[in-house]
UniProtKB/Swiss-Prot annotation:
In a number of other Mycobacteria, including M.bovis and M.tuberculosis, this protein is the first domain in a 2 domain protein. It catalyses: a di-trans,poly-cis-dolichyl phosphate + GDP-alpha-D-mannose = a di-trans,poly-cis-dolichyl beta-D-mannosyl phosphate + GDP. Its EC number is 2.4.1.-, 2.4.1.83. This is Polyprenol monophosphomannose synthase. It comes from Mycolicibacterium smegmatis (strain ATCC 700084 / mc(2)155).
Length: 265
């Protein structure tokens, strides 16, 4: 029986040299992404044919879930679908995907947007960083070599302000802590108490990064090009921003108190 996501090994291959990223699951949450989903799935497998994909659909009324089923039927070994009955937020979708992937033995779990803003052609950069020893590889817009395309200046200012705000309050050195294109070793997700993570929106990324750092895992930023979606509608909302502001402030205060008491979360 083959291990999920693992390429066939030659008879003379030393198991000690098998890379963790040979067992990779790319998790793609969807809500009304019917136009984008076939394109992104095709691009992922063109760039990295060995990886598996899990589409986590939150009951999209536009038929995204049914389309995902068609893609899985056409490629049952590499494409899988999880159907959820309601839109419970980005964080909840990823947590469900992590649980699914960990229970099936994947060694590396990747977060990727369905709208094309995270280029599948750059996925190998994240996987190479994990193979080189990173516990969490973040696709960063704000390190040398990283860039953003086609964003309104207000979105860019908001993003950079959120990252500066988070770095200051949490005391971490990550330039793009809000980034949603990232690859985790399974050990990170197993060590973090995922049942305690209740972030629903985009601050989910800040939450998990902060927890990974506090648990002693290595975090590496890899430059990527982030491109604003061309099809569909952005899911960013005022409630996402408010959640991030209040939670980051809470975590920052709690983190200082925890460090004073020697507590690790």
């Amino acid at each position: 029986m083959s291990v999920p996501g693992e390429r066939e090994q030659g008879a003379g291959e030393d198991p000690a040299t098998v890379r963790p990223t040979q067992r990779t699951l790319v998790i793609i949450p969807t809500y009304n992404e019917r136009e984008n989903l076939p394109l992104i799935v095709g691009r992922v497998h063109h760039a990295c044919p060995q990886v598996h994909i899990l589409v986590v659909d939150d009951g999209s009324p536009d038929g995204t879930g049914a389309l995902a089923d068609e893609l899985a039927l056409a490629d049952p070994d590499r494409v899988h679908v999880m159907h959820r009955t309601s839109k419970a937020g980005l964080g909840a979708a990823y947590l469900a995907g992590f649980d699914w992937g960990l229970r099936r033995g994947y060694s590396v779990l990747v977060e990727m947007d369905a709208d094309g803003s995270h280029a599948p052609e750059e996925l190998s950069r994240l996987l190479d960083a994990v193979d080189a020893g990173a516990d969490l590889a973040i696709g960063s817009r704000y390190v040398p070599g990283g860039t953003v395309r086609n964003w309104p200046w207000r979105r860019l200012v908001l993003s950079k302000t959120a990252n500066t705000y988070s770095r200051f309050l949490l005391g971490v050195g990550i330039h793009d802590i809000t980034a949603g294109y990232r690859a985790y070793r399974r050990e990170v997700l197993e060590k973090i108490d995922l049942s305690a993570v209740d972030s629903k929106g985009y601050c989910f990324q800040i939450d998990l990064t902060w927890r990974a750092i506090n648990n002693g895992f290595s975090v590496v930023e890899v430059p990527i090009t982030f491109t604003e979606r061309e099809l569909g509608v952005s899911k960013m909302s005022g409630s996402n921003i408010r959640e991030a502001m209040f939670k980051v402030a809470e975590w920052g205060i709690r983190g200082r108190l925890d460090r004073a008491r020697g507590v690790v979360r």
